[in-house]
């Protein structure tokens, strides 16, 4: 009960602070340089391998010609190049170049041009334009962008490069790259062309190249401009239904078909499903609602530190009940405040919440700076030792998803407490995306899941019930054939991805060899992810998802974690706590 009382205090304090505070300390820039060179990190401060990424220099172009000159310089001098966005929210090491003499091209200052063509229903933006800037410009002109990721701390060039998405099986679907109708790309060229050139691609004219560039992982060149389809402005009406997860496996498909922007959040340990009833509404319907998703709101830094300390305490004492109490408190709080929906832009007063598409489709209020509040920030900001977690994101063919849900229910029913760790975060988040023409996209209508879970401060520290998370991971990617989201996941999620993509993988490589024959934009890390190859195994490699264990040493025998078969999916190999077998090293 002590943990429950403490967490309630944290929740109540956080509630009243976030009511009045919508601004916070902005995230730190991903690139930092000194006289010895530069380093680049992601927004979480730590790459999957926990190793620092180095480069010799960085350039900040502000125009397309600046961008072309930067690529030309690198091509002329045989330098490796990686593009880095202002936000750098990709979890895999895609932004890290090979070799310490490489050049980073930041698009953080390449963000001045947004051009709307009303008669064509398109908008073209510099690749460094932030999602929020783009939405505000489009909405201000009386239009809406049909979809977006739920997190707005991304640039337009960065978000399409990794396949970012919202949730929809309607129209062009929930993936932003499927709303792309044109891209300008800067690629290396021969000396007679000035060592670099701009390639302009249009839907219907250059589909072979465009289908590769839509989701490119940054290995084809530097995206200069993105042209998206837009539509007449509209509103959305949103209601959350917190209810039982009974028959979830039979309901999910109809839910995805019925609600244009619907999603489901499943808290398996709590046997609760939250169905989002999210439909389109006419622009003249009354309502100025805002989606200020709880997880993306500013958090008092002391609270973020406190929550992390509590979770570390539960881990070190193997306190499942503490995690379950936290999950109960978190879920109750989300229900109380509508998970961040606000009817008037200030507080939640009841359903439905109706607001403009641009105010409902994405959120991220913790991004924005304030001159008077320096005690609040995004909960995962690495400067403040707050939340630190893994994120597994799997994309299932619709036909395979029901069996996955049933497998997770079997795993849950053996001992629900084992899954409280993911329910502290956001449970298993379920969204819907359409089949795509992008070569690295999904080939058929699909269901996407996300789940977050605790990551230890030290790479060799095992985690409470980590075997259950690993079994779910292997259920998804191995047993049920899910593909990984390119911008998320631990390394094991990418194993065998080449085979899952099928013939489109060779089409992508053909374009890659044409646009960047010298592999200027590739690195060992992007190759590792794109090819899905398994690296050599080492002591403790399974603890952080860098391998699937096959020997005890791949876990941590000295702390009682051994390589075992899965509880439901017995072909899985996971690191499980077995205290009777502890080996003293």
Curated annotation (Swiss-Prot):
Residues 1-24 form the signal peptide. Keywords: Ascorbate biosynthesis, FAD, Flavoprotein, Oxidoreductase, Signal, Vacuole. It is found in: Vacuole. GO terms for biological process: L-ascorbic acid biosynthetic process. It catalyses: L-gulono-1,4-lactone + O2 = L-ascorbate + H2O2 + H(+). Residues 51-233 form the FAD-binding PCMH-type domain. Pathway: Cofactor biosynthesis; L-ascorbate biosynthesis. Its main location: other. Its cofactor is FAD. Its EC number is 1.1.3.8. One of its GO terms (cellular component) is membrane. Belongs to the oxygen-dependent FAD-linked oxidoreductase family. Catalyzes the oxidation of L-gulono-1,4-lactone to ascorbic acid. L-gulono-1,4-lactone is oxidized to hydrogen peroxide and L-xylo-hexulonolactone which spontaneously isomerizes to L-ascorbate. NCBIfam families: pln_FAD_oxido (TIGR01677). This is L-gulonolactone oxidase 3. It comes from Arabidopsis thaliana.
């Amino acid at each position: 009960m002590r943990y429950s009382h403490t967490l309630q205090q944290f929740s109540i304090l956080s509630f009243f602070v976030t009511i009045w505070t919508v601004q916070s300390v902005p995230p730190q820039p991903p690139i930092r340089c000194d006289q010895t060179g530069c380093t680049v990190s992601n927004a979480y401060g730590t790459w999957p391998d926990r190793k620092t990424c180095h480069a010799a220099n960085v350039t900040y172009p502000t125009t397309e010609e600046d961008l072309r000159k930067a690529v030309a310089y690198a091509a002329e001098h045989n330098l490796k190049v990686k593009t880095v966005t202002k936000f750098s929210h990709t979890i895999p090491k895609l932004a890290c170049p090979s070799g310490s003499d490489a050049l980073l091209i930041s698009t953080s200052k390449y963000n001045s041009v947004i051009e709307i063509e009303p008669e064509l229903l398109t908008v073209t933006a510099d690749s460094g334009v932030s999602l929020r800037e783009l939405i505000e410009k489009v909405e201000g002109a009386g239009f809406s962008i049909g979809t977006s990721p739920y997190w707005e701390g991304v640039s337009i060039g960065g978000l399409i490069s990794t396949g970012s998405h919202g949730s929809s099986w309607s129209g062009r679907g929930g993936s932003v790259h499927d709303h792309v109708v044109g891209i300008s790309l800067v690629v290396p060229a021969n000396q007679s062309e000035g060592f670099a050139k701009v390639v302009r691609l249009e839907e219907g004219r250059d589909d072979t190249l465009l289908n590769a560039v839509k989701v490119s992982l940054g290995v084809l060149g530097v995206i200069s401009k993105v042209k998206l389809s837009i539509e007449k402005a509209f509103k959305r009406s949103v209601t959350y239904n917190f209810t039982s997860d009974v028959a979830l496996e039979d309901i999910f498909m109809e839910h995805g078909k019925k609600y244009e922007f619907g999603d489901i959040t499943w808290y398996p340990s709590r046997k609760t499903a939250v169905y989002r009833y999210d439909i389109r509404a006419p622009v003249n319907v009354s309502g100025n609602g805002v989606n200020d998703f709880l997880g993306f709101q500013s958090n008092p830094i002391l609270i973020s530190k406190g929550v992390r300390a509590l979770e570390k305490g539960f881990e070190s004492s193997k306190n499942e009940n503490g995690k379950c109490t936290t999950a109960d408190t978190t879920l109750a709080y989300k229900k109380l405040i509508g998970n961040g929906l606000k009817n008037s832009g200030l507080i939640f007063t009841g359903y439905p919440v109706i607001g403009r598409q641009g105010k409902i489709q994405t959120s991220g209020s913790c991004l924005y700076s304030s001159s008077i509040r320096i005690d609040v920030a995004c909960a995962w900001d690495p400067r403040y030792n707050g939340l630190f977690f893994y994120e597994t994101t799997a994309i299932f063919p619709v036909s395979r998803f029901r069996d996955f849900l049933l497998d997770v229910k079997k795993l849950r029913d053996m001992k629900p407490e084992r899954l409280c760790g993911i329910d502290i975060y956001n449970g298993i988040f379920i969204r819907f995306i359409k089949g795509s023409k992008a070569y690295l996209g999904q080939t058929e209508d699909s269901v996407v899941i996300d789940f977050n879970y605790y990551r230890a401060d030290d790479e060799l520290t095992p985690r409470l019930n980590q075997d259950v998370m690993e079994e779910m991971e292997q259920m998804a990617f191995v047993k049920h054939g899910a593909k990984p989201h390119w911008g998320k996941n631990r390394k094991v999620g990418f194993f065998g991805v080449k085979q899952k993509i099928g013939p489109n993988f060779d089409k992508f490589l053909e374009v890659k060899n044409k646009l960047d024959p010298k592999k200027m934009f590739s690195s060992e890390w992007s190759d590792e992810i794109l090819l899905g190859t398994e690296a050599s195994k080492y002591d403790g490699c399974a603890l952080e998802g860098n391998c699937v264990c096959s020997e005890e040493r791949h876990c941590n025998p000295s702390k009682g974690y051994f390589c075992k078969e899965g509880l439901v999916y017995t072909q899985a190999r996971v690191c499980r706590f077995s205290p009777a077998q502890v080996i003293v090293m």
